[in-house]
Each structure stands twice: as C-alpha cells, then as structure tokens.
C-alpha cells in the first residue's frame, strides 16, 4: 500500500483575500482558513480519492480553521499544519497504475457581524504521477453566497 501526500499550500492566502461588500460601502475581510489553533472542527467524508469537508461543526464569525489531525472510518486523514493543508490519500497498487487524481473541495460556512450566514467553496483538482509528484493542478473559488439572512424582529418607526 502506497501513501501519497498532497500538499495544498495555496488555500490559506487564497481564502484570506475573500471580501464581502457591505450595504454602507464598507468591505469585510474573512480570512477563512488560518492556522489559529482553536480546534474548529469540520465534518469530513472521503470517497475514493475525493476529499470533501462538508461543514464547520462550530460557529466562528470571521475565521475558520481546519482541525488536525482527524480521520474518517476509511482510515484516510486530512491534516492542517502551518497554513498548509495536506490530504493523505491511500493509493492501492493495482498492477501498472501510472497516475491517479482527485478533487479536494472545502465548503466553508461563516457568519458576518450581523449573523448572516455565507457559504463559499474552494476546489482543487489534481493528478499525481507514479513518482508521487503533482503533474497538473487547477484551482476554483466561488464567491461567498448568502444562505441565511438574520431575521429582523424590530418594528420600524414611521
């Protein structure tokens, strides 16, 4: 059984540039992936060579970090160290397998100061050759999407 370690060092600076425009013209910056060590946990599922972090299990308002280490029932692990996310993928050696690949998708939910909830997806597609080197890689980032707006209970004065 071979183990390939895929390093994703670009997600942290990518996410930290995320901005949301506010109604009053101001801009809020959400550094979503930071090595801040507070142990914010994510639910994780891994099928074949696909790694997906589905949602944060803790609410954080301006920062989300990936807890390390943890494993799922398949024995795969997803580890974050020093702002570098590593997906450790178990690759079975079936005959002459020349390469394998997959996609890592982080689905991050976060709240702003007014308790509106946003979701943002960060995708990383990759191929690994027989020498365990990344032969091709592609990044995708979606804009933050408002998925839950805070209910306003105050009566407006006329």
Labelled PLM ranges:
Residues 1-42, 47:
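Membrane-proximal alpha-helical anchors
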Residues 42-45, 49-158:
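An amphipathic alpha-helical interaction surface
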């Amino acid at each position: 059984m071979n183990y390939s370690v895929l390093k994703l060092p670009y997600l942290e600076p990518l996410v930290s540039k995320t901005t949301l425009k506010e109604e009053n013209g101001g801009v809020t910056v959400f550094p979503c992936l930071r090595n801040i060590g507070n142990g914010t946990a994510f639910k994780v599922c891994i099928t074949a060579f696909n790694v997906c972090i589905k949602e944060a299990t803790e609410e954080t308002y301006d920062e989300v970090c990936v807890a390390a280490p943890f494993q799922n029932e398949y024995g795969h692990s997803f580890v974050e160290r020093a702002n570098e996310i590593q997906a450790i993928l178990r690759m079975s050696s079936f005959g002459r397998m020349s390469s394998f690949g997959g996609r890592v998708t982080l689905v991050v939910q976060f709240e702003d100061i007014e308790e509106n909830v946003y979701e943002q997806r960060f995708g990383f597609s990759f191929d690994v050759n027989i020498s365990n080197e990344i032969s091709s890689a592609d990044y995708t980032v979606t804009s933050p999407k408002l998925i839950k707006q805070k209910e306003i209970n105050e009566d407006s004065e006329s």
